[in-house]
């Protein structure tokens, strides 16, 4: 929903893509949370698919891997899971619902330049898969109007990637617990 002309309903979710700038360097993260503090069963399923896709993309965020490797890994998860749910019939149909890249570099611009090279130590990328199922999609109506994106900032190292935004809750149950407590940890 992008028109921004209607009041949110209790069963809606909000996708918040937020950023900051510090000493001319930028960063952004995204979370998707339920207005009423609890994901519906269908929202939770899609949320967990996106989280699994993000985890897979983060694992692929290693020095020497291609910039597109996190996207390939995330897309594989989305394809498999949406087929299992019969939301899509063929893997290539996942592009209907996951229709953007998974990563961008962070630096002097929030969407810093670069896509074609191998990932290098000390660079920072985002890993931000998303699944967005609009009303009227050729799937069961229970999936309509669910959109989820989860974005974190990942430091490429000589070893394992480091999630720089790890303190911001990512799991559905952690977000629900945070919303119930109404305080930040």
Each language-model region and where it sits:
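Active-site neighborhoods and metal-handling regions in enzymes and metal-associated proteins
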Residues: 1-185
